[in-house]
C-alpha cells in the first residue's frame, strides 16, 4: 500500500509542477505528456536515483532553453525553477501552517499518507487563488527581461 501512495505522490507532484509550468510560461503541454512524464521520472529514479533527483531541477530549464533559444537566459531559468519552488513552498505552507490552523495534524512525518497527496493536489488551486487575488500577470515579466 505504501508503494501505491508513493507512486501517486510522485505523479501528483509532477502533475502539479507541469500545470504550474504551463500556466506561467504560456507554453502548452500536450495531454499525453501528463501521462508520460511522471512514468519516465519514476523510471529514472528507479534506474539512477541521484540523476533523477537532480534532473527534476534542470529539466524545465533545459526545456525552456531549447524552446526559446534566442530569448533571455535569466527568464528561462525563472520559468524553469518557479514551478518547483512554488510547489515546495505552497506544499509546506499548507502542511505546516494552514492545515494545523484548521485542526488537521500530521502525527508521523516520516511515513507517507493520503494527507501528502491531498496537499499536493491542493497546491495548484491554492496557487491560482493567490495569482487571481493578487492579479499577477506573468506576461509582464517577459517585458521586463527585454
What label would you give each PLM region?
Residues 2-146:
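Hydrophobic alpha-helices of bacterial signal-transduction systems
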Amino acid at each position: 500500500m505504501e508503494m501505491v501512495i508513493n507512486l501517486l505522490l510522485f505523479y501528483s507532484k509532477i502533475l502539479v509542477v507541469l500545470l504550474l509550468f504551463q500556466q506561467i510560461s504560456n507554453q502548452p503541454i500536450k495531454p499525453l505528456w501528463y501521462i508520460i512524464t511522471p512514468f519516465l521520472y519514476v523510471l529514472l529514479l528507479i534506474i539512477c536515483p541521484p540523476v533523477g533527483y537532480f534532473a527534476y531541477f534542470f529539466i524545465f530549464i533545459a526545456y525552456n532553453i531549447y524552446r526559446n533559444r534566442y530569448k533571455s537566459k535569466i527568464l528561462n531559468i525563472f520559468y524553469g525553477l518557479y514551478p518547483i519552488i512554488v510547489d515546495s513552498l505552497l506544499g509546506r505552507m499548507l502542511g505546516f501552517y494552514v492545515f494545523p490552523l484548521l485542526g488537521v495534524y500530521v502525527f508521523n512525518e516520516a511515513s507517507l499518507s493520503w494527507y501528502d497527496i491531498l496537499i499536493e493536489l491542493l497546491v495548484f488551486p491554492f496557487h491560482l487563488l493567490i495569482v487571481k487575488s493578487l492579479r499577477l500577470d506573468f506576461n509582464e515579466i517577459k517585458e521586463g527581461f527585454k
